[in-house]
Amino acid sequence: MELATTGKVNEVLFMNRGEGESSYAQNSSFTQQVASMATPALENAVETLFSKDFHLQALNAVDLGCAAGPNTFAVISTIKRMMEKKCRELNCQTLELQVYLNDLFGNDFNTLFKGLSSEVIGNKCEEVPCYVMGVPGSFHGRLFPRNSLHLVHSSYSVHWLTQAPKGLTNREGLALNKGKIYISKTSPPIVREAYLTQFHEDFTMFLNARSQEVVPNGCMVLILRSRQSSDPSDMQSCFTWELLAKAIAELVSQGLIDEDKLDAFNIPCYFPSLEEVKDIVERDGSFTIDHMEGFGLDSLQMEENDKWVRGEKFTKVVRAFTEPIISNQFGHEIMDKLYDKFTHIVVSDFEAKLPKTTSIILVLSKIDG
């Protein structure tokens, strides 16, 4: 089934649930490293809020696209720690922290809240009591009342789209991106244009919703998967989808997957360049860019020399965030075969020595007035 509508994507876009071997909770170490790179930016954002004369009694913060791993707990701890530091410096007496944890309805909120502990949120007798609430729903629309948020955080979520790009079939209904699930070297220009158009539309909706919810001078800290090259089909930015498409194609050749299902499937995700993100923010005009930087990390952070161990580790990471949406299209019964094939391709094509993964840290302030 094509992911042609927002409603359909919202139903199947979530990380692997639970705490098992293939779960996101057990395979989120890479995104944890990505988020840790943005910790100084998050700390600075909290400091900045205290310098803007909000006369805060409670700081309202949200983690958009929080998933169910430990990463969101680190975000809460960082915000709380910085607030306690500022309270001691400013001799605040009554400051409280309200944190909202947001993701789509399919997110494993049970595992998420099961992982909350007193080590994360502390107790209500501390100098900064912390209250946590779940908020299911799409962050591409409004989630909160006007002027109610002081701080917005989102890591590795905003590059996901509300739907597969429109216009990827011709007048006869034939697929224009045959054999691929994302932009590739063989994709016609219209595929690249459709993906950028969809990202522009979705990121603009995201900014518009936040512009209504964030207080004037409030802050947003966003971390997105991105690319360095101006070419969206550059292997550094699309290697995961290229390898996954290759694994699916091999199962098609074995008669295990219908070729039409592969041709009809386009992953609802886009890895933008710094220039594309900057252009959209400036066109929207609701926020100023306080800080923006790109950085690269090894796709596998491990000392293991065995290429098969590295390949299997990478497969677990990819499976944790792709299996729900991939299995919806191609069937749950072939997932083990598919990801086993993926491992073999990773090892044979790269010997598990993968390109660096590029990300963007973006710090925005809501324009006053």
Curated annotation (Swiss-Prot):
Annotated residues for binding of caffeine: 31, 156, 159-160, 225, 321
What EC class does the entry list? Answer: transferase
- Is Methyltransferase one of the keywords UniProt gives this record? yes
Q: Which reaction does it catalyse?
A: theobromine + S-adenosyl-L-methionine = caffeine + S-adenosyl-L-homocysteine + H(+); 7-methylxanthine + S-adenosyl-L-methionine = theobromine + S-adenosyl-L-homocysteine + H(+)
Co-factor binding comment: Binds 1 Mg(2+) ion per subunit.
Q: Which cofactor does it need?
A: Mg(2+)
Whether Cytoplasm counts among this entry's keywords is: no
A GO BP annotation:
methylation
Pathway annotation: Alkaloid biosynthesis
Which positions does UniProt annotate for Mg(2+) binding? 177, 263, 265-266
Keywords for this protein? Magnesium, Metal-binding, Methyltransferase, Transferase
List of residues binding S-adenosyl-L-homocysteine = 24, 66, 71, 103-104, 138-139
What's the domain of life for this entry? Eukaryota
- Gene3D superfamilies associated with the record: Methyltransferase, alpha-helical capping domain, Vaccinia Virus protein VP39
Q: Kindly list the cysteine pairs connected by disulfide bridges.
A: none
Q: Name one GO molecular function term.
A: caffeine synthase activity
| Site feature location: Involved in substrate discrimination | 153, 225, 269, 317, 332
- Tell me the function of this protein: Involved in the biosynthesis of caffeine. Catalyzes the conversion of 7-methylxanthine (7mX) to theobromine and of theobromine to caffeine.
Q: Which family does it belong to?
A: Belongs to the methyltransferase superfamily. Type-7 methyltransferase family.
- Protein name according to UniProt: Caffeine synthase 1
- Phylogenetic placement of the source organism: Eukaryota, Viridiplantae, Streptophyta, Embryophyta, Tracheophyta
What gene is this protein a product of?
TCS1D
